[in-house]
């Protein structure tokens, strides 16, 4: 990660965006939510990756999967926590069954900094395990 050599301090979201850029990601399909606003703020500064705003996470997932199918490059989709992440499950199964490369990004703040406490907190990794 040569881009880190001259960096004094970098956030996790900014580092993630730079890694996606290095991997050649051109588009991210998804929608904003409280849990991914920092990521989206840094994404808006990227001149290499364009956000394709969707109306629903499931649509974002299918767009990313189909992008992967048509280009052979990983399609990337973005959701917020809880129900937003569970809305990606059907498109994850579609991508897996069709051999389509896809990366799904979701966010979750530490519970102590969330206004809602544990509301909508799900173990997304366990939910995706069968797929």
Give short role names for the model-derived ranges:
Residues 2-131:
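N-terminal alpha/beta PP-like core and its mobile active-site loop of ThDP/TPP-dependent enzymes
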């Amino acid at each position: 990660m040569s881009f880190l050599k001259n960096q004094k301090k970098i956030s996790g979201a900014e580092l993630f965006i730079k890694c996606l850029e290095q991997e050649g990601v051109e588009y991210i399909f998804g929608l904003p939510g409280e849990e991914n606003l920092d990521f989206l703020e840094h994404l808006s500064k990227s001149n290499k990756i364009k956000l394709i705003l969707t109306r629903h996470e499931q649509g974002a997932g299918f767009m990313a999967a189909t992008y992967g199918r048509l280009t052979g490059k990983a399609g990337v989709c973005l959701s917020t926590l809880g129900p937003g992440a569970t809305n990606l499950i059907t498109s994850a199964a579609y991508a897996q069954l069709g051999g389509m490369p896809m990366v799904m990004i979701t966010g979750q703040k530490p519970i102590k900094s969330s206004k809602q406490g544990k509301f909508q907190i799900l173990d997304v990794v366990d939910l995706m395990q069968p797929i």
